[in-house]
Regions:
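Extreme N-terminal starter segment of soluble prokaryotic enzymes
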Residues: 1-5
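Glycine-rich phosphate/diphosphate-binding loop of Rossmann-like nucleotide-binding domains
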Residues: 6-23, 28-29, 155-227, 239
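Buried hydrophobic positions in well-ordered alpha/beta secondary-structure cores of metabolic enzymes
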Residues: 11-14, 67, 138, 179, ...
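Buried hydrophobic packing segments
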Residues: 21, 25, 209, 301-312, ...
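N-terminal beta-loop-helix "entrance" segment that forms/cooperates
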Residues: 33-57, 231-233
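Glycine-rich phosphate/nucleotide-binding loop
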Residues: 45-48, 233-334
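N-terminal glycine-rich phosphate/adenylate-binding segment common to multiple enzyme folds
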Residues: 49-162, 248
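Glycine-rich phosphate/pyrophosphate-binding loop and the adjoining helix
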Residues: 142-143, 147-186, 190, 196-198, ...
Length: 360
C-alpha cells in the first residue's frame, strides 16, 4: 500500500520524537511491504522563524494533499521565547488551531491506557490502579468556547471580557456518531459529558446525543456532568470506555486522564475529519527544556503513528505490531527517564526508537 504522509516536526523535542516514529514506520513498511512517502510541512515556531507566520497557506495546501499528517510538538518557552512577544494570532499554537479548522478536524481521540508495567507510576491508590483502565476520550475540536466570538471592552473604568460558547445540532450529531462508532469497536459503552444543569449548549448536546444513541442499541450510554466526571476519573477510571464531550471539557478531562496513567509521554492523539484524513500527534507538549538532549520519550508519537495506520489507512495488523512492540519493550524493562523505575534499563530517545523498530 502506498501512503503519503505529511510530517510536521515542530518545535522543542518535536524533531527528535518524529524521527523515531518515522524509524518505526519504516520498519513497518519493510516488514509488510508498504510504501510510506513523507513530505515536510512547517508549522509553529519553526514556521515563524522561516516565514513570519505560524502556518502559511502553502503549508495548509500541502497538508490537504496528503493522506494523513504526523506531528511532533508545537511551541516554546512562553517566558523566554521571542515567539511569545508576538500578537496571539502569530504565536506557534495559533498555527495548530488554524490547521485544525482548515482541515475540518472536528473529532479528537485521546486514549488513556494504564500499562501493567507502569502501574507503579500511577498516582492513584493501589486498589484503584491495580484494576487498570483503558478509555478513549472523544473531544469535539472545532466548535464551542475556543472558537466562539470574544471581545474585551472598557466602559466607565470597568474592563469586561466576553467569550461565547456555541454549538449547532449538526456539530453535535457528527461528533456523537463518531463517538458511538468508536465505542462499537471497543467495549460498547459511551459516557456523554456535559453541564446540562447550567448551560443551554449542554442541554442541546444531551438532546442530540440521546437521538444518536437510538441508532446504536448495542451501545450502553449514560450522561454525566463534567464536574462529576472529573471526580470519577480519579475515583474509578476503570468504569469508562468512551468519554464523549465538547471542546473545553474534553481539553481538561483528557489532560486529567493522561496524568492518572503516570506519564503523558506514553499517550497518543488523533484528530479526524469526516473522511479518512487525520492529524496524529502526542498528547504532551514541546518540552523545550529537554530538547536536543536525547532524553525525550518518543513512545507517544510512535503510538500516534500506530493510530494513523489504524484510522487513516485501515492497517489494523500493522498498528497492532507497533502497539505490541511497545508492550514488549516495557516488559523487557527498557525505560526513558520519565518512566524510569528501579531495576529497569534507562535508554535515550533514539535508542528507544531503535528498540521498537527492531521489535516490529
Amino acid at each position: 500500500m502506498k501512503c503519503n504522509i505529511g510530517v510536521i516536526k515542530g518545535d522543542g523535542i518535536g524533531p527528535e520524537i518524529v524521527d523515531e516514529a518515522i524509524k518505526v514506520l519504516d520498519a513497518v513498511a519493510k516488514k509488510y511491504n508498504h510504501e510510506f512517502n513523507y513530505t515536510r510541512i512547517l508549522m509553529g515556531g519553526e514556521s515563524i522563524d522561516a516565514t513570519g507566520e505560524p502556518l502559511t497557506q502553502e503549508a495548509i495546501d500541502t497538508a490537504l494533499a496528503q493522506d494523513a499528517v504526523l506531528m511532533g510538538s508545537i511551541g516554546g518557552n512562553t517566558s523566554t521565547s521571542p515567539w511569545y512577544k508576538l500578537e496571539p494570532h502569530l504565536r506557534p499554537e495559533a498555527g495548530l488551531l488554524k490547521l485544525r479548522k482548515s482541515l475540518n478536524l472536528f473529532a479528537n481521540l485521546r486514549p488513556a491506557y494504564l500499562y501493567k508495567e507502569l502501574v507503579g507510576a500511577c498516582p492513584l491508590k493501589e486498589e484503584i490502579s491495580k484494576k487498570g483502565f483503558d478509555m478513549m476520550i472523544m473531544r469535539e475540536l472545532t466548535g464551542g468556547l475556543y472558537f466562539g466570538d470574544r471581545k474585551t471592552v472598557t466602559e466607565n473604568g470597568v474592563t469586561t471580557a466576553y467569550d461565547s460558547l456555541t454549538y449547532s445540532d449538526v456539530e453535535i450529531r457528527r461528533i456523537a456518531k463518531r463517538g458511538f462508532d468508536i465505542a462499537m469497536k471497543r467495549r460498547k459503552k459511551v459516557t456523554s459529558v456535559d453541564k446540562a444543569n447550567v448551560l443551554d449548549s449542554s442541554r442541546l448536546w444531551r438532546k442530540i446525543v440521546e437521538e444518536v444513541a437510538k441508532d446504536y442499541p448495542e451501545v450502553e450510554y449514560e450522561h454525566m456532568l463534567v464536574d462529576n466526571c472529573a471526580m470519577q476519573l480519579v475515583r474509578d477510571p476503570a468504569q469508562f470506555d468512551v468519554i464523549l464531550t465538547e471542546n473545553m471539557f474534553g481539553d481538561i478531562l483528557s489532560d486529567e486522564a493522561s496524568m492518572v496513567t503516570g506519564s503523558i509521554g506514553m499517550l497518543s492523539s488523533a484528530s479526524l475529519n469526516d473522511t479518512k484524513f487525520g492529524l496524529y500527534e502526542p498528547s504532551h507538549g514541546s518540552a523545550p527544556d529537554i530538547a536536543g538532549q536525547d532524553i525525550a520519550n518518543p513512545i507517544a508519537t510512535i503510538l500516534s503513528a500506530a493510530m494513523m495506520l489504524r484510522y487513516s489507512f485501515d492497517l489494523d495488523k500493522e498498528a497492532d505490531a507497533i502497539e505490541n512492540a511497545v508492550k514488549k519493550i516495557l516488559q523487557d524493562n527498557y525505560r526513558t527517564v520519565d518512566i524510569m523505575s528501579e531495576g529497569c534499563t534507562k535508554v535515550g530517545c533514539s535508542k528507544m526508537g531503535d528498540l521498537l523498530a527492531q521489535s516490529i
